[in-house]
């Protein structure tokens, strides 16, 4: 079988990580002889729009769907509708809370949260007042990364965590939230951020306030790599949405072609800092989604 049509869902067009996921899906489709249809809410992370997009996708009768819910609990009925239509689903990035799916593709958000938090705490010498900003409240990635941040902090007696309001995984929101937080918080020794986009907003707020603090992020986006290169950002984690989106799309294609697909595919991550950023120092368009055999063991 060839020429399969895969409906690929992403949450928004404002977070570059989802640009990367779409690029990964497109790369894999091109080399597999499949076709991708993208479904993206016009309003970022909008539940109502995604519900409507699911109905549009079902009506288009794709061979499979690659699906990330904008909210893991609010799309249960939509996933049931996809299941009832007999369309195979590959779940990626945010694990579904209900429904049937061929496989889940992602990374261990809890572990990466623990690891990058410990990296920051070591940098601070094991003590300090650390601000923490989560992303979209309904996103599993944010919830698990924050849980990892907090569990890591419990292992460092000298670390105190100060939680800010969520930055919704948006740079403008994160900048506004951090500016308000800084206005009432005289001491911030470091900042944990659940993604790179928010980290960039946090850095802007710190700089506008004439203050300095080491900041970490997640995603290894080109803008974050540039900030590491210049010394503005301490570190990030290569939670690679391009790889995840690409492998999820390939999982859908392989399933349709009768090939075996693992029930879960968890891709490894690593911390990116001044010592190793060169491997990621290129635009998204010049990055490559690895082959299935490089990442998936059956």
Please annotate each region the language model reported.
Residues 72-111, 119-123, 129, 135, ...:
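Flexible loop/hinge segments that line or gate small-molecule binding clefts
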Residues 9-23, 38-49, 71-72, 94, ...:
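Hinge/beta->alpha junction and helix N-cap segments in small-molecule ligand-binding domains
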Residues 58, 120-124, 182, 248, ...:
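Short, hydrophobic alpha-helical segments
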Residues 1-2, 133, 137-140, 152-153, ...:
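Hinge/cleft segment of the Venus flytrap/periplasmic-binding protein
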Residues 58, 64-83, 149, 162-163, ...:
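Hydrophobic alpha-helical
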Residues 1-5, 58, 80-87, 298:
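Short, low-complexity disordered leader/linker segments with a strong preference
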Residues 1-6, 30, 124-127:
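Immediate post-signal peptide segment of exported/extracytoplasmic ligand-binding proteins
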Residues 23-40, 154-156:
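Signal peptide-proximal N-terminal region
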């Amino acid at each position: 079988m060839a020429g399969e049509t895969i409906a690929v869902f992403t949450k928004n067009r404002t977070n570059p990580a989802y640009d990367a996921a779409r690029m990964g899906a497109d790369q894999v489709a091109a080399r597999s002889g499949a076709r991708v249809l993208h479904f993206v809410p016009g309003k970022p992370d909008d539940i109502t729009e995604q519900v409507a997009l699911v109905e549009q996708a079902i009506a288009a009768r794709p061979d499979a769907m690659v699906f990330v819910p904008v909210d893991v609990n609010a799309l249960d009925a939509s996933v049931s509708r996809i299941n009832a239509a007999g369309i195979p689903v590959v779940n990626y990035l945010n694990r579904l809370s209900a429904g049937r799916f061929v496989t889940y593709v992602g990374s261990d958000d809890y572990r990466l949260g623990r690891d990058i938090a410990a990296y920051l705490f070591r940098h601070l010498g094991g003590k300090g007042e650390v601000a923490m900003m989560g992303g979209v409240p309904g996103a599993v990635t944010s919830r698990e990364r924050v849980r990892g941040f907090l569990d890591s902090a419990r292992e460092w007696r000298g670390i105190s965590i100060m939680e800010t309001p969520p930055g919704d995984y948006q740079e403008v929101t994160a900048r506004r939230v951090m500016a308000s937080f800084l206005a009432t918080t005289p001491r911030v020794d470091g900042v944990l951020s659940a993604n790179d986009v928010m980290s960039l907003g946090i850095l802007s707020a710190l700089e506008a306030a004439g203050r300095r603090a080491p900041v970490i992020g997640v995603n290894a986006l080109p803008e974050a790599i540039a900030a590491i290169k210049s010394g503005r950002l301490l570190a990030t984690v290569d939670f690679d949405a391009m790889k995840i989106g690409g492998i999820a799309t390939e999982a859908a294609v392989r399933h349709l072609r009768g090939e075996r697909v693992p029930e879960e595919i968890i891709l490894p991550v690593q911390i990116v800092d001044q010592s190793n950023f060169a491997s990621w120092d290129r635009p998204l368009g010049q990055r490559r989604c690895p082959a299935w055999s490089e990442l998936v063991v059956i």
